[in-house]
Amino acid sequence: MVSRVAKNPIKIPTGVEVNVAGQQITVKGKLGTLTRVIHRAVKVTKTDAELQTICANDSPGSNALAGTARAVLANMVQGVHTGFQRKLVMVGVGYRAKAEDKKLNLTVGLSHPVNIEMPEGITVETPSQTEIIVKGADKQRVSQVAANIREIRPPEPYKGKGIRYDNERVILKEAKKK
């Protein structure tokens, strides 16, 4: 029995180079190089323009691992080809963001400005003072950096002030009545 996710092969677009060396998979593209070691219960085979993940043995849970490995590899291929981005929006009076080189400066109502150093392979843009766009080739890293930025001032439930994802809905509570 094969995982439904792992059944689908991953198409390798032109300009993307995939190297399979045992359990270590390296994907190169115009946006960089990503390397990941996959679990030994999963076998990756490469044909002309496709990658296929299959279970290497019949151990319990290997179907799930094959599906997970397929999703991770698909994200790696997409990441080096088109990249990933997360958009954050700041809501609040005086809340501002400014990107400088590999740093993000935030003014979010604290007694001091917050400076965040971006990790390798991650870029940050501020199209306006209240918008932050985090870009990169590694989906996990982009999402983690965006979550770290949001964690500085998460949206509060009464007025909705804080840093939120662009598509996030904040459910507002009603104030206490007398």
Curated annotation (Swiss-Prot):
Pfam families, per database record: Ribosomal_L6 (PF00347)
Biological-process GO terms, alphabetical: cytoplasmic translation
Keyword Ribonucleoprotein: yes
InterPro entries: Ribosomal_uL6-like, Ribosomal_uL6-like_a/b-dom_sf, Ribosomal_uL6_a/b-dom, Ribosomal_uL6_bac-type, Ribosomal_uL6_CS
A GO term for molecular function: structural constituent of ribosome
SUPFAM superfamilies: Ribosomal protein L6
Gene Ontology cellular component annotations, sorted alphabetically: cytosolic large ribosomal subunit
Keyword set, alphabetical order: Ribonucleoprotein, Ribosomal protein, RNA-binding, rRNA-binding
Subunit architecture: Part of the 50S ribosomal subunit.
Family named by the database record: Belongs to the universal ribosomal protein uL6 family.
Function: This protein binds to the 23S rRNA, and is important in its secondary structure. It is located near the subunit interface in the base of the L7/L12 stalk, and near the tRNA binding site of the peptidyltransferase center.
Name of the featured protein: Large ribosomal subunit protein uL6
